[in-house]
């Protein structure tokens, strides 16, 4: 099934259909997953991996032939023709990637910037066939080019939340620092005013307050 000319958010049925066509799962496994209760907000690969279905592509003599999230990530990335990338949070310039777009925009578009250089932005996604966001991305990254990579839904959910929380914490700390600096400046101005031997009439009440302090 070719979906490269369409923009779609893949769901559980789409993934199961493709896995069945690719002979990764059988009809029994398909029926088990599709008829079970599930969290519809969860990424379909996470849901499928929880069932531990036999992997039809695993070698016959393999000790572990279960369908894992790691294998499913490789399968979907290959189907989309995207490189599979694993985030190393220590190598990500968090302020740089989060300033490109809001958390809510990144969440709704199923994306996360993970690298920013002088001329390029690397954008990760766990929905490789959803491309609606590409129509507006040039407005966000300005003159830079971009390339898209596939991220595990487990990683993108975790680090999207953590990166933006870090940015909010930094912004909050900077705000507190600026307020403290402003308070110090105001106090210094008052003290200097208190030393003025010929204050303006409008400032005399402030001088009295400073002298009282």
Where do the protein language model's features map onto the residues?
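N-terminal, intrinsically disordered, highly charged
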Residues: 1-213
């Amino acid at each position: 099934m070719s979906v490269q000319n369409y923009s779609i958010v893949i769901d559980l049925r789409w993934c199961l259909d493709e896995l069945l066509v690719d002979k990764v799962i059988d009809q029994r496994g398909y029926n088990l997953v599709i008829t079970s209760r599930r969290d519809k907000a969860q990424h379909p690969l996470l849901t499928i991996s929880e069932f531990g279905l036999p992997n039809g592509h695993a070698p016959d003599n393999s000790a572990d032939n279960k369908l894992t999230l790691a294998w499913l990530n490789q399968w979907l990335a290959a189907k989309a023709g995207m490189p599979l990338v694993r985030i190393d949070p220590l190598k990500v310039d968090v302020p740089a990637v989060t300033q490109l777009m809001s958390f809510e925009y990144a969440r709704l578009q199923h994306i996360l910037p993970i690298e920013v250089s002088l001329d390029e932005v690397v954008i990760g996604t766990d929905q490789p066939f959803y491309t609606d966001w590409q129509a507006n991305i040039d407005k966000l990254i300005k003159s830079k080019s971009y390339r898209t990579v596939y991220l595990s839904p487990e990683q993108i959910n975790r680090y999207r939340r953590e990166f933006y929380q870090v940015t909010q914490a930094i912004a909050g700390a900077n705000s507190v620092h600026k307020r403290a600096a402003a308070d110090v400046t105001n106090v210094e101005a008052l003290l200097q005013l208190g030393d003025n031997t010929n204050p303006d009439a409008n400032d005399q009440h402030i001088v009295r307050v400073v002298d009282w302090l």
